Amino acid sequence: MNLIPEILDLQGEFEKIRHQIHENPELGFDELYTAKLVAQKLKEFGYEVYEEIGKTGVVGVLKKGNSDKKIGLRADMDALPLQECTNLPYKSKKENVMHACGHDGHTTSLLLAAKYLASQNFNGTLNLYFQPAEEGLGGAKAMIEDGLFEKFDSDYVFGWHNMPFGRDKKFYLKKGAMMASSDSYSIEVIGRGGHGSAPEKAKDPIYPASLLVVALQSIVSRNVDPQNSAVVSIGAFNAGHAFNIIPDIATIKMSVRALDNETRKLTEEKIYKICKGIAQANDIEIKINKNVVAPVTMNNDEAVDFASEVAKELFGEKNCEFNYRPLMASEDFGFFCEMKKCAYAFLENENDIYLHNSSYVFNDKLLARAASYYAKLALKYLK
């Protein structure tokens, strides 16, 4: 690998910062400590700093020269509601809160790149987006709705995530869908309760809800093109509390994922049609509440071509995978992808414990690798 020597020299200093963030994890939109630390460091490095963008988001801006070119680099800051089970000397000090997805590493790598870039000559504007609440709370959307790109516009935006694939390659990137969309649905099947001995005097919600559970599983197998990818997963089905009482309501909670917008739209249409048909056939009411967790993380071809050249320079072409099979997991960087030309990459964490696990450990070697990637992207574009 051909990492930036000055960044490698700063590795030890920023490992301590990463461990400090790891010890003090914060859930989405509660990243007060982390945001304050980020803002403090950026000010020390000479950036203009803007806080409370999307509640707890932070933006650092550094402009040099007279070019109108603008590049955005993004990192997420939030932790997960997990009790850490590692034996790390810097393990979480908070009960049931842990950096189990490596966002402490993402944040620190961007800070490391920020320090290095502040000492370099470039021509244009560097925007650093430190995003809150990636874990299902829509932090990217909150920043956008708070005027992120009106105030701090970028021609391209780049991000990355550590990924413990356990493979030989160090860097993964592809054109098109990198990660799936994620939509959550909460469905209420509303009947009329009654005594278990007299179902004819009630409107049992459990039977139509059971039909609904089965019918929803047919969406992918019977409607989605087999060459496309979609997942419908029912995670909760609840009704009643007693053996002799027909309840008023049954509830279903599920997630729906897709790798393209057409399939995503198709699954949504089928959900509503199935619910409508079952409601009519059983003379009950069905209410649907949909929440958009994340759009498809759709990489832009131009951005991928540019980032691929940077990755090959840094990691060597043999260590890069550009024909990567997309993940069905989601990432709210997808909201950025809907607005700007973006490229989202994975860096191998070299650890066999997967994300969102209480024993997960971020590999500190990635700090210099990711910071070098961030820095090369900026310097190559703003040359």
Describe each region flagged by the PLM.
Residues 21, 60, 73, 103, ...:
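Divalent metal-coordination and catalytic microenvironments
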Residues 72-74, 83, 185-187, 344-349:
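Non-cysteine beta-strand/loop elements that form the S-adenosyl-L-methionine
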